[in-house]
Amino acid sequence: MKLQVPRSSLKRSIFHKKRKELLSSLPKIEAKAVARYIRISPRKARAIANTIRGKSVEEAFQILAFSPKKAARIMEKVLKSAVANAENNFGLSVENLYVSECYVNDGPRMKRIWPRGRGRADIIQKRMSHITVVVRDRSKEDEYRKALEELEKKISSEE
């Protein structure tokens, strides 16, 4: 027995595939790096992430270098990785890069037992974080925006 697929969903899937192909033709202006399962509390890491968001890469490195926090060392490694990805994978120049996105998500928690008095025990949660840094090229944003507008016109004319 052959599975019947509704025509509307078939049309939509073809449209999305075509749109995805067209979007891949856009110029690459951003690179990303993710560090997962890092043994630091997300709350502590977010404090550092908030300080570098929106800053140029050079300024972000300076902020992280002078921060005494453990999260700053980790964030510095992730930022270095994102910059290397931008440089090597997409050929973006380091001088024009800025931190467009920087966020910290909760990872899994390790539960540990902490013995207390009178035979009781408390559970301590050792938290982990997933840290994501996205760097973007300021000089190519206008070019990207124009290409995106042209692409949207092309897609809307095909519908």
Curated annotation (Swiss-Prot):
Source organism superkingdom: Bacteria
GO cellular component term of the entry, any: cytosolic large ribosomal subunit
Protein source organism: Thermotoga sp. (strain RQ2)
Disulfide bond residue pairs: none
Gene: rplV
UniProt keyword RNA-binding, yes or no: yes
Gene Ontology MF annotations: rRNA binding; structural constituent of ribosome
Protein's UniProt keywords contain rRNA-binding: yes
Name of this protein: Large ribosomal subunit protein uL22
Keyword vocabulary terms for this entry: Ribonucleoprotein, Ribosomal protein, RNA-binding, rRNA-binding
Role description: This protein binds specifically to 23S rRNA; its binding is stimulated by other ribosomal proteins, e.g. L4, L17, and L20. It is important during the early stages of 50S assembly. It makes multiple contacts with different domains of the 23S rRNA in the assembled 50S subunit and ribosome. The globular domain of the protein is located near the polypeptide exit tunnel on the outside of the subunit, while an extended beta-hairpin is found that lines the wall of the exit tunnel in the center of the 70S ribosome.
TM region(s), chain numbering: none
